[in-house]
Amino acid sequence: MYDISGWKHVFKLDPNKELSDEHLEMICESGTDAVIVGGSDGVTIDNVLHMLVSIRRYAVPCVLEVSDVEAITPGFDFYYIPSVLNSRKVEWVTGVHHEALKEFGDIMDWDEIFMEGYCVLNPEAKVAQLTDAKCDVTEDDVIAYARLADKLLRLPIFYLEYSGTYGDVELVKNVKAELKQAKLYYGGGISNAEQAKEMAQHADTVVVGNIIYDDIKAALKTVKAVKGE
C-alpha cells in the first residue's frame, strides 16, 4: 500500500477530456507521485473505467476523486471524497456523502478512502459554480476553514482549489502554517515549472491539471520542479 503523506506532486486527469495514449504514457512515466482521476462535469462510469484501464498499464498510484456516486468503480488504489467546506449547499458538504454511505457503506474499504476538505477560491471555476461555493472570502475565513478541516473534523487533506487561476502564494503559506496534521494540497493555474516550484515551497502536495491538455511539455517539467529530483 502506498503512503499518500509523502506525495509532493500529482497529476489530475479529467475523464471528460481527450488525452492521447502517448501523452498519457508521458504522464504516468513522468515520476509524479500519483495520478488523480476527477472532474466537475461529464464524469461517467464509462469514461472513468476507460481512464482506469489506461492508467493501470503503468505502475503509478491511481486515485479516483469522487464527484458522482454513479461513476464509482473498484480498481483504484485510493478514493478521495471531497467536502466543499465553503459551499452554500449542504449537499456538497455532507449531503452527497450521506447518500453514498447509505448505498455503499457496507462494502466500502475504509483503508482506501480519504476525505478532502475543499476550499474553492475561484468564482469562475466550474467547481465553484456547481457547488455554489462562497469565494468572496477573507484570509481569516480561509484560515478558519483550514482549522475546521484540521482541528475539528480531523480530515487528512485540506485542499486549496483555485481551479483555472494561479493562487495567492502568501495565503497558501499562511494556511500551511496553521495545519498540524492535515496535508495541504494546492491546485489551480499552474502553467509552468516556476509556479509549481513556488507553490511546492508551501503546499505539501501540488496538483497539476489543466496544463496537461494545453502544453504537455510544460506539464512534465513541473514534476522535477516540485520534487527536485
UniProtKB/Swiss-Prot annotation:
It catalyses: sn-glycerol 1-phosphate + all-trans-heptaprenyl diphosphate = 3-heptaprenyl-sn-glycero-1-phosphate + diphosphate. Its cofactor is Mg(2+). Pfam families: PcrB. Keywords: Lipid biosynthesis, Lipid metabolism, Magnesium, Metal-binding, Phospholipid biosynthesis, Phospholipid metabolism, Transferase. Mg(2+) binds at D14, S40. Its EC number is 2.5.1.n9. Homodimer. This is Heptaprenylglyceryl phosphate synthase. It comes from Bacillus anthracis. The gene is pcrB.
